[in-house]
Amino acid sequence: MDIEEIKRQKMMELQQQQAQGAPNPEEIQQQQEQERAAYEAQKKQIMKKILSEEARHRLSNIKMVKPEFAEQVEMQLIQLAQSGRLPIPVSDEYFKTLLDQLYTMGSAKKKRDIKFVRK
């Protein structure tokens, strides 16, 4: 799909919603909250199957300190588990190596060099 096709499809959806009487913003927000809660519950269930108890505890600690990084780790774990490239359950030691790899990949992108030019 190209961008123009997506725009046309979105425009048609909006026109259909207006013709049917669009739901009010509270209903939309409530529906989004329900979807988000269902998504989080499903993700938690998958993490329970994938990770050992110690690894889950480590992930919850990371989630408190760096929620964005924890989200990235969870997505990576789910993808690896679905592709069958992950030993289930993931031990804490294996989880540490995965975290180290993910962290070094992420920090390599963000690393900046500051140079002082003196005259």
Curated annotation (Swiss-Prot):
One of its GO terms (molecular function) is DNA binding. Coiled coil: none annotated. Pfam families: dsDNA_bind. InterPro entries: DNA_bind_arc, PDCD5-like, PDCD5-like_sf. Keywords: DNA-binding. Residues 15-32 have a biased composition (Low complexity). Residues 1-11 have a biased composition (Basic and acidic residues). Residues 1-36 are annotated as: Disordered. Belongs to the PDCD5 family. NCBIfam families: PRK04239.1 (NF003268). This is DNA-binding protein Maeo_0998. It comes from Methanococcus aeolicus (strain ATCC BAA-1280 / DSM 17508 / OCM 812 / Nankai-3). The lineage of its organism: Archaea, Methanobacteriati, Methanobacteriota, Methanomada group, Methanococci.
